[in-house]
Amino acid sequence: MDLPVVLIADKLAQSTVAALGDQVEVRWVDGPDRTKLLAAVPEADALLVRSATTVDAEVLAAAPKLKIVARAGVGLDNVDVDAATARGVLVVNAPTSNIHSAAEHALALLLAASRQIAEADASLRAHIWKRSSFSGTEIFGKTVGVVGLGRIGQLVAARIAAFGAHVIAYDPYVAPARAAQLGIELMSFDDLLARADFISVHLPKTPETAGLIDKEALAKTKPGVIIVNAARGGLVDEVALADAVRSGHVRAAGLDVFATEPCTDSPLFELSQVVVTPHLGASTAEAQDRAGTDVAESVRLALAGEFVPDAVNVDGGVVNEEVAPWLDLVCKLGVLVAALSDELPASLSVHVRGELASEDVEILRLSALRGLFSTVIEDAVTFVNAPALAAERGVSAEITTGSESPNHRSVVDVRAVASDGSVVNIAGTLSGPQLVQKIVQVNGRNFDLRAQGMNLVIRYVDQPGALGKIGTLLGAAGVNIQAAQLSEDTEGPGATILLRLDQDVPGDVRSAIVAAVSANKLEVVNLS
């Protein structure tokens, strides 16, 4: 069998290739060369890039086999995420690969600005020894304002606190209780401006945050404040900051990012009190290596059909360690629902009960859709394209939660309703410390069977000797029954049997079973 092709379009560390493993074929292409890229992508199952290669709609259209685009870094400016989503292509980045490097660089700028390191260095290199010109300011005992408490902002806050500073922060999306856990005083933006001796910005750039530190904001700061921006260019108005430094209101500043990059001309460059670097926040050997290995792991997971935590175009909410083990089980429940349905359902609902209901479980809706469509769609069904497939085929999907779960700590029910009103309902749970996947209910009938391997599901008219007839026919065909579960209908003469087998059932044996027990439904379902 041919190995999936991973196309690397930019320079990446050798550790990235090693992390991809030996179950893929790695190819290289000069990604910035458009002609070469378009010639190479048709055979690619995965495309790895950094910032030099542009992955737009044209590239995606030329890659019919493509399952994932992986950006070895944080930014995604060079990847058309919307076009990828429309084609069902997963897009991932490495959001945590550079967070330590970025946090350390912000601290380096803050320290350099507070102690006039760059000025003193230039003076001494000019053969001038004049200590009195470079009197700095301590961080100890000061108030440091962190604007944005994301991953990097939290790291900066923790490190600044170690200097003996009092840390305050502004972030409208962080709960006060969470800030308190971090030992940080949360407040409004204006209050932070008025109180902080140092301000370090750690926000994403959005229409709402662009120009956040402008002339008006700077006027609200304490005289002698020191400002650092190592997050995104354009968050700080560079002209307004330069004016504030010249006036003496802002003591010093440190910037690693600029509104337009590459940037070789700025009013800030004329000011000795301002320390500038050319967007070096992620420029460490460790960050670059980590970015490559992180996206390599995402590629490995995607090509194996598994959930990819760092996917940016999966509308499934945050997937934490409590929810992640349920993804595979719920996908299998979707497969079983499809097998027991006479037609593609008009609606699919996922109901989560018990302890799991308190988590963000939106991703389980996508898992159920993946299972449902995996048996009826020839192409790969992913967390990305499953919602689009449902919309195209008129299948509505919802997820609900409830606290009641009398027999299990948590249960997930997947319910499909056909256009004629007929219902198929499968429930499953994770059992014991090993989180064994189990089917616990089929159409209202209680079961207790592991959700694994080859399974034979039969609905038939209950009659004496039916199970013996089924076993005899399977045994004669050399098919071994590993486990069995039988449940009678609560109303009427019907029964449902679920058998786990060691192999598939030949077509003629299926027909013989249907005839022998008057089965009105027989399906073989692979839950491997």
UniProtKB/Swiss-Prot annotation:
**InterPro entries attached here?**
ACT-like_dom_sf, ACT_dom, ASB_dom_sf, D-2-hydroxyacid_DH, D-isomer_2_OHA_DH_cat_dom, D-isomer_DH_CS, D-isomer_DH_CS1, D-isomer_DH_NAD-bd
Report the pathway entry: Amino-acid biosynthesis; L-serine biosynthesis; L-serine from 3-phospho-D-glycerate: step 1/3
- Asked if Lipoprotein is a keyword of the record, the answer is no
Binding of NAD(+) occurs at: 151-152, 171, 230-232, 256, 279-282
UniProt-listed Enzyme Commission number(s): 1.1.1.95, 1.1.1.399
User: Belongs to which family?
Assistant: Belongs to the D-isomer specific 2-hydroxyacid dehydrogenase family.
Quote the SUPFAM superfamilies the UniProt record gives. ACT-like (SSF55021), Formate/glycerate dehydrogenase catalytic domain-like (SSF52283), NAD(P)-binding Rossmann-fold domains (SSF51735), Serine metabolism enzymes domain (SSF143548)
The root-end lineage is: Bacteria, Bacillati, Actinomycetota, Actinomycetes, Mycobacteriales
Protein name from the UniProt record: D-3-phosphoglycerate dehydrogenase
Entry annotation: catalytic residues:
232, 261, 279
| Any GO MF annotation of the entry | NAD binding
User: Is NAD included in the keywords of this UniProt record?
Assistant: yes
**Cited PANTHER family:** D-ISOMER SPECIFIC 2-HYDROXYACID DEHYDROGENASE FAMILY PROTEIN (AFU_ORTHOLOGUE AFUA_6G10090) (PTHR42789:SF1)
A Pfam family it matches:
PGDH_inter
